[in-house]
Amino acid sequence: VSIAVTSAAIGSVAGKFVEKAWNLGEKWITEYFKNHGKEAQEKAKENALSFLTKVAESVKVIQDNTKTDPVTLEVINTSFKDPDFSAVLQRAIIISARTPSEDKHKILARLITERLLANSEDMISLASSVAVEAISALKAKHLYALGLSVLVEDIRPTSVPKGLTQKQLNQAARDWWLKNLSPLIHKVEDLSDIDIRHLVGVNCIEYELFIGRDLAQILKSGFGEWEVDKFLSEIEEGKKLKEYYEK
């Protein structure tokens, strides 16, 4: 894959990021894989370029959907002068080079994009390094399991309309959970006890987080009283979520 063609196709600012990152990344990959076979080295470069392309696409989406211009050439140039950003980017490129997984590439790309926009000492910056390292120790299904856990435990709609009838509230809550569960729940169907133990072992989750928790009460949070028991017993996504939490 030609880096020049890739960066040109993506656009000016995002493309510049790819060029600058690849100028460094190719050297990092060459050094890391110097004692490996030629085919492994070439595949590593292909994987890393796929990841960088996803970073650029992520940057472009932010540019296109924001009235301001959050990612400028100045922001990019400043980031590459930051030792912490450079170290996080290096680790992300090496991790991406070791796998063809698009799921991992997308998540790494999101992390690097968020880090690109963050101040050097805020929580996003501090968490980025930890998150990148965690990805290196996880399979894609583990990442989906973590995403599902965060969704169920922490994420709720910013607001629920006032004055809904019980029927309307039941429908609103059901629709919200279906929309947000659907991309994740089918990705963790084959998650085993060994997978859960692995997540505990790499300090991504704690068993105590789930002990004694009533799933129905968790799903009511943010909505109030709605037909959650019916959702968990009759709707496919609800039944799968219940099975997942009972593992």
PLM regions and their residue ranges:
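Membrane-inserting effector segments that mediate pore formation, membrane fusion
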Residues: 1-49
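Amphipathic, membrane-inserting segments
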Residues: 43-90
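Long, low-complexity, charged/polar intrinsically disordered regions in eukaryotic proteins
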Residues: 81-144
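Non-catalytic interaction/regulatory modules that flank or connect domains
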Residues: 132-138, 143-148, 152-169
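Eukaryote-specific, cytoplasm-facing alpha-helical/coiled-coil scaffolding segments in long proteins
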Residues: 136-139, 170-179, 221-231
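Short helix-coil junctions and helix-kink-helix linkers
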Residues: 165-190
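Short amphipathic alpha-helical interaction segments
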Residues: 182-244
